[in-house]
Amino acid sequence: MQSPQLRFLPVSGPAARDGGVRRMAFWDWSADPEAQGRHVVICVHGLSRQGRDFDVLAQALTPRSRVLAVDVAGRGYSDWLADPMAYQLGNYVADLAALVLQMRAEVPDAAIDWVGTSMGGLIGMAIAAQPALAPRRLVLNDVGPVIEWPALQRIGDYLGLNPSFASEQDAVAYLASISTGFGPHSPAQWLAFSRPMLRERDGRWWLHYDPAIAQPYKAMTTGMEEVAARQFVQDGERTLWALYDAIGVPTLLLRGADSDLLTRATASEMGQRGPRARCVEFAGVGHAPTLLAPDQVAVVQEFLWAA
């Protein structure tokens, strides 16, 4: 099996916790030498995940594409932030904009596409709404301008708990228990999908992210009165719809048929305004499709390679 190269991009903005130059990690799946650089796919994960989530998709794309799977700040091998309240979407967008500009500097004629799961899709919407940064094609995986409040609360129940486990098996079982929305997977798939989420220290297994990523999130979902929090979410939805309506590139929307975060009504509206995303639903899946199943991979592959 092909393995990616772990690379780092120095980024500005919020300081790193260790006081040095902050670095954003990304996994570089290089394409065939003859196709190198001509088609780049940037993949960005969900709120508490990391770039190796895209291993299966990347291996399917690398015959014709170079895939860059990012560890967003505070996740995986990217630096942790000195200020926990800096774990905000705007800072993530700035970091990813730096990567887009770096790729365009390295390969000026490259076609750059974007695949974003959940939070990675929100970052992608903000990038795609800016003509100077917009990808050629955009894939939004189970996310849109309207994010359902119960889903936010569900995620807030486990985000940042920082549990540790006596064995890798126990850690994998825990991750599976909080990820039932991902749909059915074999034990081997759960293990492969979970291993990059873990790190071993002092004989225990820990989640491979900064628990402090939860602080801004919990300030919204548990730190406000419900009325104020809901108003905050509604204001955010207006902003996200404005971003979505500004997108002018072909857009594919993936949705788990049982998703509690992206409703069918929101998906339908996304097909009628802005880039008029084409929606593909996957039965037996909630939030969010993992892009491990062959049918999920094929839909993305066909969309990105269509041009």
For each feature predicted by the language model, list its residue ranges:
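Short beta-to-alpha linker loops that shape the active-site pocket of alpha/beta-hydrolase fold enzymes
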Residues: D71-G76, G144, A283-G286
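Conserved HGGG/HGGXW glycine-rich cap/lid loop of the alpha/beta-hydrolase fold
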Residues: D28-W80
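Conserved hydrolase catalytic core segment
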Residues: D109-W149
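Active-site loop/oxyanion-hole signature of alpha/beta-hydrolase fold enzymes
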Residues: G19-R22, D32-P33, V56, V72-V115, ...
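Alpha/beta-hydrolase fold catalytic core
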Residues: M1-V41, T62-S65, P108, D295, ...
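Conserved alpha/beta-hydrolase catalytic His-Asp/Glu region
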Residues: A166-M224
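Conserved serine/cysteine hydrolase catalytic core
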Residues: E200-E269
